[in-house]
Amino acid sequence: MATGDGIIAAPPSLESSSLDPLHVLPASSSTAARSLATSIPALTASFSVVSGFSSHLPPPPVTPPAPSTMVGWIGWIFSFIFQVIPSVLYWIVTFTTITLPTWLFTLFSMSLTFTMNFTTLLLIALAVVSTISWFIRYRFLNMYSRLPPEPQRKEPQLDLFPDVPDSDTKPGLANYLDEFLSAIKVFGYLERPVFHELTRTMQTRKLIAGETLLLEEEKGFCLVVDGLVQIFVKSMRDRKSGSDEELNRMAGESSDEDDHRPDGRQGYQLLTEVKNGASMSSLFSILSLFTEDVQLRYADSSASSASSIGPGLAIGPDSFPASPREMDDSPHVYQGDRLDPASHRNSTAEDLPAVPPLNLGESQVPPAHSARSESRKYSGKTRRKSVHPDIVARAMVDTTIAIIPASAFRRLTRVYPKATAHIVQVILTRLQRVTFATAHSYLGLNNEVLGIEKQMTKFTTYDLPNELRGSALDRLKDKFIKERDRLGQEEVTKGIALHNPYGGRRPRSSSFRRKEAALQAKMVASKRPVSMVAQDSALSDRENSGVSPGDLLSTIQLSRFGPRYEHLAPRLLSPLTEKEHSPLRSPSPMIPGRASPFHRKESLDEDALFRESILECIMKGIGLTGSTNDFLRKSSHPSGDVSPKLLSYDSRRQKAVFSNNAFGFIDPYEGSADGESESMMSMSVTSAGGTSPIVNLREELRNDIEIVYFPQGSVLVEQGERHPGLYYVVDGFLDVGIPVDDKEEDLVGSSRPAHEELFPMLRRTNTSSSRVSGSAAAANDPRRKKQSRRSLYLIKPGGIQGYVGAVASYRSYTDVVAKTDVYVGFLPRASLERIAERYPLALLTLAKRLTSLLPRLLLHIDFALEWVQVSAGQVIYHQGDESDAIYLALNGRLRSVHEGPNGKMTVVGEYGQGESVGELEVMTESTRPATLHAIRDTELAKFPRTLFNSLAQEHPGITIQVSKLIAQRMRDLVETPLAEKGGEPGVSGTVKTAKSTLNLRTVGILPVTAGVPVVEFGNRLLQALHQIGVTNGATSLNQAAILNHLGRHAFSKMGKLKLSQYLADLEEKYGMVLYIADTSVNSPWTQTCITQADCILLVGLAESTPSIGEYERFLLGMKTTARKELVLLHGERYCPPGLTRQWLKNRVWINGGHHHVQMAFRLTAEPSHPQTKRFGTVLKQRVQVIQAEIQKYTSRRIRQSPLYSAQTPFKGDFHRLARRLCGRSVGLVLGGGGARGIAQVGVIKALEEAGIPIDVIGGTSIGSFIGALYARDADVVPMYGRAKKFAGRMGSIWRFALDLTYPTVSYTTGHEFNRGIFKTFGDSQIEDFWLEFYCNTTNISRSRAEYHSSGYTWRYVRASMSLAGLIPPICDEGSMLLDGGYIDNLTVDHMKGLGADVIFAVDVGSIDDNTPQVYGDSLSGFWAVVNRWNPFSSCPNPPTLSEIQARLAYVSSIENLERAKNTPGCLYMRPPIDPYGTLDFAKFDEIYQLGYAYGKNYLEKLKREGSLPLPEETEEKKKLQRTLAPRRASI
């Protein structure tokens, strides 16, 4: 061992082993094995050497022998077992028992000493604390920065589907048929036999280019099949000149719009151009074809008649002094050469006496009819004018026209009366929608339209009999006077209805009465002798001839009706019948000893007599008794002398007219819902038991007639309201007028003050557009003081008010007010609809009267207006096309889309029912600025430019009216904020959303997947719509209702046509229609719900899987462009964070937003049949109930029930959704102002307590924070708690001191500010908020404002609250966002764009010091500091550098604030918070109480002024339905 160099020599054994381990290891191993095999002591002796060696080396390997023999292998295995395994065991034992304890003893016996100073210890401590704080700061306290990225949801791209191929691309016969079918669509749906009857006599005619056609000589329905025809009208200034010269000259000249004579006088003017598939006839000319043989007025020769106009009398020009037309030469007025409609058709011409007709009481009819007829053939000057005079057609190219002659319409009227009545009803409806609505609401032709109603009173005035005047009327008035004294003035103005003892009985259905009558007839026939049956059959033959309500008791045996009618026999006697002493009337043999009821007053019920008499006059007025009464008198005496008055004779055609016309009697069969076949018309007109159908009608109407009293000044009908029914004036006067503004508007209109038009939903809207507010308040409403009425005419006793509107289901163009105390008989609209459906003569009479009273101006407008029907997705015109017409939406919805230079589609606007589009381009003769396409199947009125030019020359007032409309639209465009016109992504959705929320008429409710309770959802939504007061009401449709209406046509092509017309009528009748898709996904009704909807609500269960459902796939396959919104149903008022994003992530087609609705529902439908209760089933159900109860208490979910809620039902989720669909949402806009925004919490609480619902919330800066708190839960209590907690954090100086950093970008890092907002909102997203919410920010990277309505709440609220210099901007998709108040601190414009109707704007911003500065042209900073501290200085302090920067930043915000204050519908609120600073968060309670007190005072002030938009005012409007539910007098 050499120790000098520190090297220790190893033992020989170890040294040799280390030198040659390969030879030493096997030897030592074999020696150890042999020693172990011989004796244990030898193993103990060599323990120390082996342990030292084995502790450093692993177990030695064993080299296997050469595989020569099997014995060698076996030996090697035994050697391995006895050598290696013991060595390993020995190593483990020695290490754990000796080596390891030795190491531990050595370690613990060692001592270490560290010596360091305080500086080192301090540095080490700081390092440790810094490491821990860094770990906590960046690992635990910044969880907001590690949230998964959730970018804002992008607006879906607009899809324009390819155009529907035009029909003119089809070859040959298909093109011809398509053009013809498109032209006769104006008739509505036609059944196959009706279609064949109409077209079997159709003729075609070829016109060469330049050939003219006098339409006034064409007696038929003309349509263009192929070619182009121009329609000309003779100028009014040149009407009296001859027309032959004009026609000859016009045929050879070019197609200018105006032709001029050499002397400068005008000739013919171009009205319109008719292309393929369009009609050359107007709606009025079609009506004239159907009503040639209909009388204008029922003949009443008694003294009580209000007019002497009879069916055989001509109406001269002096009969209608206000008529714009000459009535004496109109074929529809002149009745002298027509036969009485009641003449029997079975009689032949030879049976008739060859005598000319006599006219009793008038001499205005020319005596020579044949001479007049002959002269008409040869003299153009003396020929009778048609319904379309001075109308000439000229073919521009070789044209093929089709003509359906007038004889086809006459035969159709005779063979298919119910189909004729339906066609007339369809045309009357379209006449109102197309011609009347356009002339009244769009062109301002009030005098022409309202003059028709005024002149109509000439036909409908019939006085009550004299016996009901005097003392009888006085006794009736006494009953009302007693009740009026008992009631208050407010109740009396709604009307007092006389008690009707039979009014409460529910009338039985017509089918039930028919079955009952048939059964009773069989029973009577089986019991009576043959002679009685023969007598009844003879009577039945007489009744088949015709029945008049005035002759009921003279032809009907009362005993057949049972004891009740025998008891009521005196009361059923018609007073009008008794007072007519006609020599043709004989006493009825059925009622022996009948005497006049007026001589036995003690046995009469005068109320019933009044009702019978009023009903008699009303039925005469609507034309139900004219032909039938005369016909009954004639047929009752076949052997007697026939009065010439009762039998007219046509000397030209040598045959009797109306000999067996279907309208000569009243059709007995009610138009059932399943559409009964017209073949049933050939059956007997009487019921099976011999009962005339008119008796059933009289019984029904007698129960429906109400006698109502209205005091002076009461409003019976309001402008824009659908007529509640017919008012027959018994005593008093009704004043018919229109509301006019006292202050005339200029060309661009005058905007009302902000408080004038606060809540448009509280006022009825005009039928032309939902944006034009009507007046629906009571006469004493303080908000109507700015309007006055202009009286048009008076309705005197005996007159009928509402005839045109009630029979044809029009809306009223006028107000009807009681001029004096008035007593009226009221027949509800439902009864009139029943009459019109069962008795076609009422509609035909109305159509006849309308055609006779039509002004020439309306005729020309009706001729030129084209009724157009387009399919869903069809493009009406493209961008860049020539503007040739103005389009008015009658039904459906249109969307205007502008294509930018980069191909991006931008929605310009959407247009609903009653709105127009294209005036500006037509007036300026420019090209179309955008593409217009139909969102769904749409009906349009096409107003050609040629008609506008023609009207502008002859009626300048029309030009002024349209100019006002265009000027108003231009004003709206000028006043629209520039931000809303831009194409930036953050602002582009404003205009689109605003246009799409207005004037929605149809809403489709579609489930996401099967099992969603859409029926219950639709019913609750409908109930909410009724409660908020939708204009004209709302209704819902499901498959059951549609099948009930269609009946046997439900699954045929006819059913589709019938359904389309039915749906169009419903949309016209109601303000909103809900289509509930309650069928399977592939059913036709589901497809109908999608195609008919302006807006589609996709309803899904929030707790179910958010995958795409089968109904959504079907919706996407339909390629509809309607607006789509998602509705999530929650069982509780709670939405888990991120749930809404999962639903919206895969639904890029949702372009209308989403809604959260709480609704309790059953996941499984109740079984229709109760299941048998077995023991196993009962036990299983009981276990499930117990398990559910346990989970209720053990679940960790916190039940989100509102802790505070105002006592108002209008804050419900369904009411919020209903207001959104109606465009009546209430918005709340909160401005920025730092700690001053705490006052907004108090204002919101005041709004809650006042019961004002809030639907949409928008905020800026601190307003975004407060608004997000309220929108999250829609509750005041959690908002108050979280806001106070956040204010406590912001009031801590130490938190900001610890967050300070080097002011390169800002003074603080923003971490503490981020944590304060994140601790308030967590990971919730804006989509999960219960109320719709948005906040605005300023994008300094792109220099624009952005509005955020999706994404993490804390990020965008933090960005909206980021003051420049204090907090760094927040990064969002590469852009830097700062406080939104720099551009717009009060976002009223954006809220208005979202569809909010009433907006509460709370401004808490600071007010700048506007003191004039006079410090000169230069300024010393030292002088400014001294002046600031000098109390004796008179110079104002100049602003500091920071104040100048702040004012510079808020320059644009001040302009937007001033515009927001003047926005219509905006209620501007500014609490007195000026003494408080931006960072005074420590004064939370003080500022909160100040805002609460201000809010209560402000709302109370609005309530006193009548300007508070409370839903209760809508309920008051419902009470104006005066006669629908009148107050009964206790008599």
Curated annotation (Swiss-Prot):
A nucleoside 3',5'-cyclic phosphate 1 binds at residues 689-809. Residues 1-72, 137-1531 are cytoplasmic. The keyword Coiled coil does not apply. This is Lysophospholipase nte1. Belongs to the NTE family. The active site is at S1261 (nucleophile), D1379 (proton acceptor). A motif (GXSXG) lies at residues 1259-1263. Its main location: endoplasmic reticulum. The gene is nte1. One of its GO terms (cellular component) is endoplasmic reticulum membrane. Its EC number is 3.1.1.5. The chain crosses the membrane at residues 73-93, 116-136. It is found in: Endoplasmic reticulum membrane. Residues 242-265, 303-385, 766-789, 1510-1531 are annotated as: Disordered. It comes from Aspergillus niger (strain ATCC MYA-4892 / CBS 513.88 / FGSC A1513). GO terms for molecular function: lysophospholipase activity. Signal peptide: none annotated. InterPro entries: Acyl_Trfase/lysoPLipase, cNMP-bd_dom, cNMP-bd_dom_sf, NTE, NTE1_P-loop_dom, PNPLA_dom, RmlC-like_jellyroll. It catalyses: a 1-acyl-sn-glycero-3-phosphocholine + H2O = sn-glycerol 3-phosphocholine + a fatty acid + H(+). PROSITE patterns: CNMP_BINDING_3, PNPLA. A motif (DGA/G) lies at residues 1379-1381. A motif (GXGXXG) lies at residues 1232-1237. Keywords: Endoplasmic reticulum, Hydrolase, Lipid degradation, Lipid metabolism, Membrane, Repeat, Transmembrane, Transmembrane helix. It is a multi-pass membrane protein. Residues 768-779 have a biased composition (Low complexity). Intracellular phospholipase B that catalyzes the double deacylation of phosphatidylcholine (PC) to glycerophosphocholine (GroPCho). Plays an important role in membrane lipid homeostasis. Responsible for the rapid PC turnover in response to inositol, elevated temperatures, or when choline is present in the growth medium.
